[in-house]
From Swiss-Prot:
GO terms for molecular function: G protein-coupled receptor activity; G-protein alpha-subunit binding; lipid binding; lysophosphatidic acid receptor activity; phospholipid binding. It comes from Homo sapiens. Signal peptide: none annotated. The gene is LPAR3. One of its GO terms (biological process) is bleb assembly. Belongs to the G-protein coupled receptor 1 family. This is Lysophosphatidic acid receptor 3.
Length: 353
């Protein structure tokens, strides 16, 4: 029967995994990582709070897509909390942690990733429902959106708690990983592979929607008389969502690959030398998301700017490169326009034949 080590401190597990946490987290490297991490976290709290407040304040954003976007901002805000907790419980402090405190530290990080990933999956479903029906916004009710948001956080909390619930190596030291000394290598493989598969599924779904919208836009454009901005609205919205997805994949994939290599017990891969920099890269994702929202959406930018600078609502600054949310947020108007475009296109094709 294997001996369990619930009462041990983390120095016992770090020493067995040959992880030199003290040397790596002292001196210039530690100062750089902590300074950059602190700046990122402050920006995450500020910018994502603005996004959530903008969705609450501006009635143009009171639609399912923007509610889910606000929830993604909430997930990024939660990621900032997780990284702050990590910064206060890392370096030389890591070896003094109890098992339960270390589980909490890692569980917060795991939950933040799962919340963002699951939320992107829900947004993919919402976009698929609306675009395939040629509507700017889906017909999800507020009740259903609320249930989806609660489901996102329930899944995130559960995934973050799985190691604490028993999938760990406290009773089987030989199965412990190197980067996460009390996580089983089998759990790391499961967790990373499931996340990478979710990445792949999302990329395929969004590419399918993107190709569909692009094809429909090209077919309908010659037969419709609406403004260019309105004709291109579905494509612009898809480009915004795909930019968010692309940033998420780029920022998180390297870290997941490193964890997968550790789970596969790759001793020659040098995972210890890059883990902290890839962790900062993952943190960067929560930094760039609010920038993407404000850059791509004209009204989001205007609302956030007015909250910061107290500018007059009657004279918002215009930036033509962004999506006019007055078009995006009027679901019935946008949907009717697309439906009218389909009808006009059908009439033109019929008369031509």
């Amino acid at each position: 029967m294997n001996e369990c080590h619930y009462d041990k401190h983390m120095d016992f597990f770090y020493n067995r995994s040959n992880t030199d946490t003290v040397d790596d987290w002292t001196g210039t490297k530690l100062v750089i990582v902590l300074c950059v991490g602190t700046f990122f976290c402050l920006f995450i709290f500020f910018s994502n709070s603005l996004v959530i407040a903008a969705v609450i304040k501006n009635r143009k954003f009171h639609f399912p897509f923007y509610y889910l976007l606000a929830n993604l901002a909430a997930a990024d805000f939660f990621a900032g909390i997780a990284y702050v907790f990590l910064m206060f419980n890392t370096g030389p402090v890591s070896k003094t942690l109890t098992v339960n405190r270390w589980f909490l530290r890692q569980g917060l990080l795991d939950s933040s990733l799962t919340a963002s990933l699951t939320n992107l999956l829900v947004i993919a479903v919402e976009r698929h429902m609306s675009i395939m029906r040629m509507r700017v916004h889906s017909n999800l009710t507020k009740k259903r959106v609320t249930l989806l948001i609660l489901l996102v956080w329930a899944i995130a909390i559960f995934m973050g708690a799985v190691p604490t619930l028993g999938w760990n190596c406290l009773c089987n030291i030989s199965a412990c990983s190197s980067l996460a000394p009390i996580y089983s290598r089998s759990y790391l493989v499961f967790w990373t592979v499931s996340n990478l598969m979710a990445f792949l599924i999302m990329v395929v779904v969004y590419l399918r929607i993107y190709v569909y919208v692009k094809r429909k836009t090209n077919v309908l454009s010659p037969h419709t008389s609406g403004s260019i901005s309105r004709r291109r609205t579905p494509m612009k919205l898809m480009k915004t969502v795909m930019t968010v997805l692309g940033a998420f994949v780029v920022c998180w994939t390297p870290g997941l690959v490193v964890l997968l290599l550790d789970g596969l017990n790759c001793r020659q891969c040098g995972v210890q030398h890059v883990k902290r920099w890839f962790l900062l890269l993952a943190l960067l994702n929560s930094v760039v998301n609010p920038i993407i929202y404000s850059y791509k959406d004209e009204d989001m930018y205007g609302t956030m700017k007015k909250m910061i600078c107290c500018f007059s609502q009657e004279n918002p600054e215009r930036r033509p490169s962004r999506i006019p949310s007055t078009v995006l947020s009027r679901s019935d108007t946008g949907s009717q326009y697309i439906e009218d475009s389909i009808s006009q296109g059908a009439v033109c094709n019929k008369s031509t034949s």
